[in-house]
């Protein structure tokens, strides 16, 4: 996990103390993790695992929420430890991302012996890939071919495209295993080219549009055409993948 500032570390320690006060001996652990996308990098995300969780516990946390947010923390995801383990198959991408990239703030290691079934990851990736493809097709029709609108569509879709490729990188690969530490754009692009065969240059162009803005795209329609074909190839890869 990327390093957090000393201020955020202090805020996480304070959060852990608050949760220990609420849950007492039922507190299991608090882990910090980066957001799945890049739209909320100003807040530090965390997962709190406890033995039992009820309405009274949530109500007891209410007076502390504003303070957490003022210190730059997102409201923590609070789950029962057993609940987390039982729903790994329901949220394989979300929980798999936390397993792959986290830092323990306080408590025991809650992930010892825990793994996400690669087949669950594949099914979730297939849904994500097909949804992305459908939304791009629909979005292109809505642009009516207007170049600026096409550029906006590409830029708006870059973050979910990046997330999709990052999730796919965690699927075991026969020749190279899984790439669970692929986070930077350049690494995401290179892994997509190696594994799926889509152009790393194309991936970098699409991802760059999210940060540099759609005005940086010289020929939006030409880029979109290649982008759409690449997403079709991504879906075909995930559809055919087998553990």
Language-model features, listed with the residues they occupy:
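Conserved nucleotidyltransferase catalytic core and NTase-mimicking acidic/glycine-rich helix/loop elements
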Residues: 115-243
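A nucleotide- and high-energy phosphate-metabolite-utilizing enzyme signature
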Residues: 1-13, 23, 102-107, 186, ...
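Conserved NTP/Mg2+-binding pocket subregion across the NTase superfamily
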Residues: 3, 7, 65-152, 156
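Short acidic/histidine-centered micro-motifs embedded in hydrophobic/aromatic stretches
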Residues: 33, 101, 209
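Metal-dependent nucleotidyltransferase catalytic core
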Residues: 1-22, 36-91
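Short gly/ser-rich loop at a beta-strand->alpha-helix junction or flexible surface loop bordering the NTP-binding
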Residues: 27-36
């Amino acid at each position: 996990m990327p390093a957090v500032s000393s201020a955020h570390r202090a805020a996480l320690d304070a959060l852990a103390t608050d949760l220990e006060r609420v849950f007492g001996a039922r507190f299991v652990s608090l882990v910090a993790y980066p957001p799945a996308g890049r739209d909320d990098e100003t807040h530090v995300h965390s997962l709190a695992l406890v033995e039992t969780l009820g309405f009274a516990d949530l109500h007891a946390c209410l007076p502390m929420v504003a303070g957490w947010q003022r210190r730059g923390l997102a409201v923590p995801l609070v789950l029962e430890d057993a609940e987390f383990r039982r729903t790994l198959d329901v949220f394989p991408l979300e929980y798999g991302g936390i397993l792959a990239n986290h830092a323990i703030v306080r408590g025991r290691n809650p992930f010892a012996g825990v793994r996400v079934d690669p087949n669950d990851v594949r099914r979730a990736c297939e849904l994500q890939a097909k949804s992305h493809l459908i939304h791009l097709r629909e979005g292109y029709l809505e642009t009516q071919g207007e170049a600026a609108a096409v550029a906006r569509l590409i830029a708006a879709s870059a973050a979910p495209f990046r997330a999709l490729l990052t999730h796919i990188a965690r699927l075991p690969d026969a020749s190279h295993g899984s790439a669970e530490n692929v986070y930077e754009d350049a690494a995401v692009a290179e892994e997509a080219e190696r594994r799926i065969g889509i152009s790393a240059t194309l991936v970098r162009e699409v991802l760059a549009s999210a940060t540099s803005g759609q005005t940086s795209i010289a020929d939006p329609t030409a880029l979109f055409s290649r982008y759409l074909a690449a997403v079709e190839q991504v879906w075909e890869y995930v559809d055919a993948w087998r553990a």
